[in-house]
Amino acid sequence: RKAPRVHVPVWQSFALSEVELTDSYFKKAMDLHKGYLLSLDVDRLIPHVRRSVGLQGKGDNYGGWEKHGGCTYGHYMSACAMMYASTGEKALLDKLNYMLDELQECQKQTPDGWFITGKRGKEGYLQLLQGNVVLNQPDETGQPWNYNQNGNSWYCIHKILAGLRDAYVYAGCRQAKDILMPLADFISHIALNLSLIHISEPTRQEAI
């Protein structure tokens, strides 16, 4: 009789805090990244979010891609959470918690917790749910990736939901999960009730 086979995992995950870089090119690069994250002003990353729910912005948006208000703050939450998990730098956690406080204040101004895309963006999703898709409305550069006046919204939503998830998973911020769940409830209801064509057409526009 053969002995029972014992499953030995080929690999297993480990926490970011279990890896410590010594003085090297990678450590210098990591320190540069950490310094950059600490240099950014949270109030300049999300003034458009505050304005979209009727609150006054506390700063001016950064220039370039952020000039008209973008979703970089989602990536910023991910970066701060992971860098905090790697380094234990409390200043990163402080920035992350401040951003979460601000986003939760925005969320409280809405009837259903949806604050990401503002009123116009929300209406665009509801139009999708009704089967209405207006494609190829170019943005200010002429790029035809706009639909239902929503820009590249699935892309932005992913950044923000992932940022909140990472704040919870990597930095242990319970508040991030509290903000995330109403957002996930709203957008999952939309996504689960869309036809394949109404999923594929907008996402194809975003891939152009």
Explain the meaning of each model-derived region:
Residues R1-T72, A91, N97-P138, R174:
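Low-complexity, Ser/Thr/Pro/Gly-enriched N-terminal "stalk/linker" regions
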Residues E18-V19, S24-K28, Y76-K90, H158-R174, ...:
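Well-ordered alpha-helical scaffold segments within catalytic/enzyme domains
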Residues L21, R44, H48, C71, ...:
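Generic alpha-helical secondary structure signal
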Residues E66-G70, S86, N150, W154, ...:
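Alpha-solenoid helical-repeat scaffolds
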Residues M83, L96, L103, A167, ...:
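Alpha-helical solenoid scaffolds that mediate protein-protein interactions
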Residues S86-Y98, N152-Y155:
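Aromatic- and glycine-enriched glycan-recognition loops and surfaces
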Residues L129-G151, L183-L196:
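Asp-box/WD-like beta-propeller blade repeats and closely related beta-sheet repeat scaffolds
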Residues I197-I208:
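Single conserved hydrophobic/aromatic residue that forms the stacking wall/gate
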